[in-house]
Amino acid sequence: IGGKIMGFYMLTTLLAILSSTGIFYVFQPGDPRLASKLTADVSAIASSDVSISIKDTIVNIIPSNFVKPFLESNMLQLIFLAILIGIALGKIGDYSKILKDIFEACNSLFLKITVILVQFIPIATFASVLTVILKTGPDVLLSMLAMLGTFTVGIIVMLGIYCLLILLIGHLTPVPFIKKYSPTMLQVFGLASSNAAIIVNMDACEHKLGIPKKIYSLSIPLGATVNMDGTCIYLVIFGMTLARIFGVEISGGMLLSMFFSVLVLSVGAPGVPGAGLVCLSVLLTQMQVPLAGIGLVMGMDSLLGMMRAMSNSLGDVAASLIVAKSEKILDMDCLLYTSPSPRDT
């Protein structure tokens, strides 16, 4: 069961990255003329015109020292170091538990700091958006609407992909699923957090969709951590849009590097409001895009966070439904009819 759940999560993550990339190239949001208005440092824009080959991407994964990846926020090199340290921890015996506890404590510390800082995002958002509008005029509003519209299309396309997977893999009509889960989707939209949505998703799985506890007790909490399809769409569309605005050339090597970074960031993103903005700043640094463009996104991030959480949760529940059907333990009466099934009586 665990293998099926993880396999489905990896499939939908890949589809989210590929579909959002295609949607970006179709609509191509972002006006390059905004770059000179978003930052006064013209040299920063000129120097950001880089081209990275696939060979360079692979070679540059290995850092020259242990300090440089942290100073440069090089995501691929940090991942390499994390894997290397993890392998080494497994070979040092009893000391590994001590170091593991230290790493977990540091992770909890920085996550708590992030949660505290997120509380100040509305103030920073107001100041940032006001500054950007005063500098750029109405052009920035049109660009923001174009990005929001493109992201919305990405979310709708992902919903269609979930329905298609339910039909093709689960051999179920997606109509009852959407009909039964729609009220919960609105709840998740209001919560704007994958972690906060765990309880309501579990309740929907059991009482509305007929998914047994042995499935959703694993798939929903796991999905809230590793299955972030909405976050993938967000990172790809806004990362590539800001790269286009600032004139950063997206070569094949950079696209490959971005895909890998998006995959890791989406898996590692905490399911709390505002976490997507933090991940986007990391991705922009990796792509050598000036962080001045964050101001374009901050004004919309509360709405974007709600849409991300809704898409993330929809993927988790769709996976639970398909796996339950494949295991032949899905309560079809509960899914297809509004009356309570024998399990609920």
Spell out what each predicted region is.
Residues 10-14, 18, 152, 156, ...:
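Hydrophobic transmembrane alpha-helical segments of multi-pass transport and channel proteins
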Residues 274-336:
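Hydrophobic alpha-helical transmembrane segments of membrane transport and translocation systems
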Residues 337-344:
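Conserved small/polar residues in nucleotide/adenosyl-binding loops
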